[in-house]
Structures are given as structure tokens and as C-alpha cells.
């Protein structure tokens, strides 16, 4: 890995996974530069893609605050699309700190990844204390990163920033905290999910692991078939499909390359 000086130029791409926006680069700059770049481009995270000895590529994920994340569903789909197009692949494997993930690139409108974990650590919890109007009953689940799922009658009436920050730092989930998903059932097969993301410390337009968490919990709560299929809509208005098939769970949705050319600039001092 090369060293970086404060005035060194950089090259990267901008991607969006259903509204979840990222810088994708083939380098890892110093953490303060990651924060600067994310603020400059107003994105949710930084995706570093490097060669891998056990997969088609290796992915390291950083939140916009510079902290490293163990998983990002939408970011993973963006990387799957990038690697597939760069290498001319349809089936793609990506190495992460949580293991090697397998996916399939059909088109930019349809990028699928197998998100299956051996243990989702699903737990129903009654919170020790809540804010006025907030449900006491929530569901904890690990979809690569920890999430708390909260079912509400109308997500548009939820103060996502206030409630999200409260639950993200709630004493019941210390010391690491959680991402928070507010979920409304729209139809039998459709969920509306708004997510407060740890590491961004705000609501994002979409969160892949959050939509996955919401779908998995909903499948249990509403006693869906083992092989289920749900459509999940995020704040951005974009929809992903989450489905279970033969014991595996898949996340499928569109990816957008926001900037077709590489960007060139200078790192902040």
C-alpha cells in the first residue's frame, strides 16, 4: 500500500445502492482523509476494493465518520457491480471481514448477493426505558452489523433522528451500539423502512443490512413461509427484494454509478 501525502491526488468512483451513497476507491487513505472525502462528496461511506487471494476482490468498508464497518449490504452490491463490470463477470465473490460473500450481476438494475449467516442472533427485547410514544418492544438482529428493528404504525410520523440516536446509544445495547430500523408494514409482502445508521450518526436514504434485518424479523413476527419474499422500500423510494430460498437469504436491487469518470482532487491537510 502506497503512502499518501496531504496534497496527493486521488481517483475514485461514486456509487449509489438504492440511495445509499459511497465513494469506491482502490486504495485506503488515512482515516482523516476518509472523513474529508465523505464530507466533500456528501456520501454515507467509503468502499476500498483491493485484490484478494481467495475471492474476486477484497472489500474494506468505512463509515463516513472514519470508523470501519464489518458489513454494508448496499455497499457490497455496489462493489459486486463494479467488480463484475471491471472483470467481465456474472458470478462474483467478495472477501470481507465477515467472510466471502457470493453474488450475481444481471444488470445495474439487478445485483444480487447471498447475505446468509449461520446465526442472525435474533432476540426480542423489552427496553428498560423509552422516549414518549416509542414502542418498548424491539428486536435485535445481526445481519453483518447489529440492528434494532422497531415496528411502528406510520414511519412518516417517527422522529427518526431523535429516536434513532436515542436507541443507537441506548444502555441496553452498550458498548458498541446499534443501527436502528423503523418499520411499517404496507402490504402482506411490502415493508417501508427508515434507518438511522451507526457510523453516519444520522438517517440515511437507504440501508441494505437494515432492510435485510427488517425483512428477517418481519418473516418471524408474521410467521411467513420458510421460503419467503418481501419487497422493502427505503426513504429514497427505491425498492429491494429480500427473499429466502433453500435456507439461504438474498438481497437484490439496483445499483447506480453516479459518476462515470474518475474524479481527481487533493487530500485535505
From Swiss-Prot:
The active site is at residues 72, 207. Signal peptide: none annotated. The keyword Transferase does not apply. InterPro entries: DAP_Epimerase (IPR053407), DAP_epimerase_AS (IPR018510), DAP_epimerase_DapF (IPR001653). It is found in: Cytoplasm. GO terms for biological process: lysine biosynthetic process via diaminopimelate. Pathway: Amino-acid biosynthesis; L-lysine biosynthesis via DAP pathway; DL-2,6-diaminopimelate from LL-2,6-diaminopimelate: step 1/1. Its EC number is 5.1.1.7. One of its GO terms (cellular component) is cytosol. It is an enzyme of class 5 (isomerase). Pfam families: DAP_epimerase. Keywords: Amino-acid biosynthesis, Cytoplasm, Isomerase, Lysine biosynthesis. Homodimer. PANTHER family: DIAMINOPIMELATE EPIMERASE, DIAMINOPIMELATE EPIMERASE, CHLOROPLASTIC. Belongs to the diaminopimelate epimerase family. This is Diaminopimelate epimerase. It comes from Chlamydia muridarum (strain MoPn / Nigg). The lineage of its organism: Bacteria, Pseudomonadati, Chlamydiota, Chlamydiia, Chlamydiales. The gene is dapF.
Amino acid at each position: 500500500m502506497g503512502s499518501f501525502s496531504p496534497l496527493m491526488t486521488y481517483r475514485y468512483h461514486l456509487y449509489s445502492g438504492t440511495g445509499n451513497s459511497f465513494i469506491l476507491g482502490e486504495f485506503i487513505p488515512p482515516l482523516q482523509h476518509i472523513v474529508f472525502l465523505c464530507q466533500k462528496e456528501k456520501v454515507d461511506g467509503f468502499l476500498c476494493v483491493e485484490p484478494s487471494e481467495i475471492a474476486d476482490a477484497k472489500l474494506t468498508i468505512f463509515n463516513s465518520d472514519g470508523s470501519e464497518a464489518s458489513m454494508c449490504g448496499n455497499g457490497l452490491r455496489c462493489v459486486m457491480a463494479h467488480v463484475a463490470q471491471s472483470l467481465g463477470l456474472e458470478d462474483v465473490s467478495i472477501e470481507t471481514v465477515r467472510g466471502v460473500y457470493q453474488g450475481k450481476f444481471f444488470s445495474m438494475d439487478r445485483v444480487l448477493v447471498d447475505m446468509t449467516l449461520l446465526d442472525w442472533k435474533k432476540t426480542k427485547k423489552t427496553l428498560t426505558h423509552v422516549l414518549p410514544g416509542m414502542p418498548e418492544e424491539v428486536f435485535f438482529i445481526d445481519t453483518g452489523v447489529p440492528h434494532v428493528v422497531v415496528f411502528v404504525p406510520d414511519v412518516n410520523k417517527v422522529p427518526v433522528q431523535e429516536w434513532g440516536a436515542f436507541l443507537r446509544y441506548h444502555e441496553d445495547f452498550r458498548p458498541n451500539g446499534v443501527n436502528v430500523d423503523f418499520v411499517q408494514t404496507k402490504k402482506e409482502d411490502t415493508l417501508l423502512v427508515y434507518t438511522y445508521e451507526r457510523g453516519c450518526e444520522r438517517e440515511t436514504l437507504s440501508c441494505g443490512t437494515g432492510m435485510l434485518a427488517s425483512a428477517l424479523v418481519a418473516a418471524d413476527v408474521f410467521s411467513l413461509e420458510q421460503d419467503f419474499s418481501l419487497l422493502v422500500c427505503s426513504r429514497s423510494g427505491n425498492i429491494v427484494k429480500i427473499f429466502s430460498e433453500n435456507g439461504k437469504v438474498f438481497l437484490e436491487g439496483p445499483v447506480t454509478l453516479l459518476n462515470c469518470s474518475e474524479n481527481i482532487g487533493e487530500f485535505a491537510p
